[in-house]
Design a protein with these regions (language model features):
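Short loop/turn segments that flank or connect secondary-structure elements
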Residues: 1-261
């Protein structure tokens, strides 16, 4: 299944569910180190952890890494800031390739380390949002691929262990929970025709808090969890409030802190 196409086009969850795998599921794949997965890829989305790891490795800021490798735009459905890796050059190659080799192999983005697996959060969509987010499950799919071979049988669990990816990835679950909650508020504001200037300030604040405000000389997770612990209560409050109260709260908040976000 092409999970990236599904996510871009907002596919039917029932279709996705047919392809979901758990930790004991098996798939056939053996990497031939051909490098195809590093070229002609326009589907790589960076998380804050990915950006931090690259910035830490090269002694750069988060903003520098984003400017050198990516574009940032509002997600079509989520309306959230999306950091999308942009291929470069005549070979349409990953900007992190140097002389044909991955320059961040030891800290590559999780989506690259997982390949050909994809990872999604899954929950019962018949439940209220808060109950959905309290009962998140991590599931996996095999992406459509045109490289490698089918000579090796792998379990999902073995594949994760081989590339040092935690089965119970605290960041992945917490990040998705925060992202989904904030997306709900962002969409509510857009649908209510929130004053454009206020929406822009809120969007930029989310982008800076979620993606930029990290000290790469310090560990990532304590900083991320501190940010999430501060932001999440406000997002919960905004998501539960009537829209006019949401707008009023944001106007008051930015009047106190200034609008130069």
């Amino acid at each position: 299944m092409d999970i990236h196409k599904y996510l871009r086009e907002g596919g039917n969850p029932d279709e996705l569910e047919q392809h979901l795998m758990d930790l004991d599921s098996t798939f056939r794949f053996k990497c031939r180190r051909c490098g195809k997965c590093c070229k002609n890829q326009d589907t790589i989305i960076f998380t804050p952890r990915d950006i931090y790891n690259i910035a830490h490795k090269f002694g750069k800021t988060m903003e520098q890494v984003i400017e050198e490798t990516s574009e940032v735009y509002p997600g079509r459905d989520s309306r959230m800031p999306i950091v999308h890796m942009v291929p470069r050059g005549p070979k349409n190659a990953c900007p992190l390739l140097v002389d044909g080799r991955c320059s961040v192999h030891d800290c590559k983005p999780t989506v690259c380390a997982l390949f050909p697996l994809g990872r999604v959060v899954w929950f019962d969509r018949t439940l209220p949002l808060e109950q959905q987010l309290d009962n998140i499950q991590v599931r996996y799919i095999v992406n459509d691929i045109d490289c490698g071979s089918a000579k090796r049988v792998n379990t999902v669990c073995e594949w994760l262990a081989r590339f040092g990816i935690a089965e119970d990835d605290e960041f992945f679950i917490r990040w998705n929970r925060l992202f989904i909650r904030t997306s709900s508020v962002m969409r509510k504001l857009e649908e209510a025709h929130c004053p454009p200037a206020l929406l822009v300030v809120f969007w930029r604040t989310v982008y800076k808090d979620f993606y930029l405000n990290y000290d790469t000389s310090k560990e990532f997770m304590p900083q991320f969890l501190s940010m999430a612990d501060q932001v999440e209560p406000l997002i919960r409050e905004l998501d539960a409030a009537p829209i006019q109260r949401v707008i009023q709260t944001l106007e008051e908040r930015y009047a106190k802190t200034g609008t130069d976000q």
